[in-house]
Amino acid sequence: MDQAEQLRIIKANNQIRPTARVITVTSGKGGVGKSNMSINLAIQFRKMGKRVIILDADFGLANIEIMFGAIPKHNLCDLVYEGKSISDIITWGPMEVGFISGGSGIAGMSNLGKDALTCIIQNLAELDALTDIIIVDTGAGISDSVLEFLVASGEVLLVTTPEPTSITDSYSLLKALYRHPRFQEDFTKVMMVANRVSNIKEGQVLFDKLNAVVTRYLKIPMTYMGCVPQDPQVMQAVMQQVPVSIQNPGAKASQAYQRIAERMCEKEDDTAQEQQPRRCLLYTSPSPRDRTRSR
């Protein structure tokens, strides 16, 4: 019995129907500003009145807590191995943004098995009463844990920079997602943000370039959510362990994060008006199909 089937049985037995919006933020390579994207979008969502919890899914190398300047008492080890509830391991950061630590420097968290991943994904449903949006901040690359969260999420936000390696690795990540036997293109919607661009045109060109290849070879539709300019204020905020959206709301990057958050909320409103089901977790998706990926 695979993980997807286990989760569907859990839902049938417990009648769990999550309604919190789940957005998984990911990247093909490290160092592209993915975690900064996660925390600043969370802050912008809070400014819009949304309740937000971040799951730091970069297991063993978690850095959301560092960027928030917080010291969590608990992490996912306490959920997976100690039997604590997921609500017990939430740390509340600035502006009442909650986050769940993936465990920084904990070797056992860097190579979680499928049972542990199932436990984490299952427990996300229990956050429904506490939050409107769950942001899953994955590690970079195409590890099993990253792909499990991508196929389990209704929305994937891909962070890419103009660097050739970032573009190539982003395509490799999407190809791995496309080949995953449980990937459902009708369930998981892929969005992209161009980060650290010199201007708006560069961001649009970057998206058009990647989207053309993805559309041709993978047939995965992508939605462009906008770009974030290269801004020294971001690094200054990181050094002071305060999100730039709080430290300097007028910074170019902060304004860009705000526009992206607004677009993402508009996208959710459009879905609601069309009376489509909210995209949450894997066990609300259609049954998986066995498919052969040739490319």
Can you name each region flagged by the protein language model?
Residues T215-P243, Y257:
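Beta-strand-loop-alpha "switch" segments that mediate conformational coupling across diverse proteins
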